[in-house]
Amino acid sequence: SLFSFALNAKDYRPGIDYQFLDEEVQTRNPEKIEVIEFFWLGCGHCFTLEGLIRDWKKNLNKDIDFWRVPVTWNPPAKEHAKLFYAAEALGMEEIIGSAFTSIHLDRKFLTSEREITELFSAFGVEPDKYQAISNSFRIKSNINAADVYGRKYEIMGVPAFIVNGKYKVKASRDIPTEKLLDVVDHLVDIERSQ
């Protein structure tokens, strides 16, 4: 109802709970509402959010184009981006959850080729196959694109979300990690109503 939308709109304040991007960025599919998550496997807040993201994705409307971009700020982040894109290329999203668990609960930081190859081997991926995929042109292109996206959206911390090329949402004093998806949903509702 209009009343509940008005109440909801008061809960999340522009400039405090989310920011407008300086310039609107064209989305990859103008027919849908785009939501991009920027993350790093080594980020504790991203790990906290991972289970929530998994549940959130199960209930996404067909008008949402959700995709993820790993940050590539430093050598460990680049290795994790390679791991993410290799798992995605293999259609093995469960490796991402396992990587988060390895890093944050098992204290295996997955920054060496050997550690990452062992992780993929645990899922039945032969070391040679992982090497071929992770060093492929496709993966290198994805990592370069991730770097470009991170710069374009001025991602300085993760987790962060970009909603429909207009808004940036990130954890803050006012918005804890667990509430990020609520703010994203609020912005999606705004976009849907326009």
Residue ranges and their predicted role:
Residues 39-42, 57-60, 87-91, 103-107, ...:
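Sec/Tat-exported extracytoplasmic proteins
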Residues 122-194:
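C-terminal cap of thioredoxin/glutaredoxin-like
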Residues 50-57, 80-84, 96, 113, ...:
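Extracytoplasmic/secreted envelope proteins and their assembly/folding machinery
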Residues 94-95, 111, 129, 158:
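Alpha-helix N-cap and coil->helix boundary residues
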Residues 47-50, 77-81, 174-177:
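Conserved strand-to-helix beginnings and helix N-cap segments that scaffold or border functional pockets
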Residues 41-45, 72-76, 102-106, 138-139, ...:
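Solvent-exposed loop/turn segments at secondary-structure junctions
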